[in-house]
Amino acid sequence: MSPLAKLLEAALFAASRPLTVDELCSLDPQAGEGTVRAALAEVRETYATGGHGVELVEIAQGWQFLSRREYAEAIDRAQFALRPRRS
């Protein structure tokens, strides 16, 4: 992945809510909206084709990592869906 895609991946992973494209653009002031959207597509494709348990989705006017639907029931049963934060 490109450096920008990795930066977006890290920010989205750390976020507790969906992040808008404008918020993601603020991570790299030199990157315009088109560049950020291309990097988001790169991250999304990486997670779509890599056999991961999470996926990058566009929801609520923003982007967020979510567990794949096929794991939702097991995660709900385990009752540990909230993960601890790292700074």
Predicted regions and their residues:
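Short amphipathic alpha-helical interaction segments
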Residues: A31-E42
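Alpha-helix C-capping/helix-to-loop hinge sites
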Residues: A11, L27, A78-A81
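Long, charged, low-complexity, helical-prone intrinsically disordered regions
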Residues: M1-P3, R17-P18
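A short acidic, leucine-rich amphipathic alpha-helix
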Residues: V21-S26
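Short, leucine-enriched amphipathic alpha-helices that occur as contiguous helical runs
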Residues: L4-L8, S87
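Short basic alpha-helical hairpin corresponding to helix-turn-helix/winged-helix-like nucleic-acid-binding
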Residues: E42-S87
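Short capping segments at the starts of secondary-structure elements
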Residues: A11-T20, A31
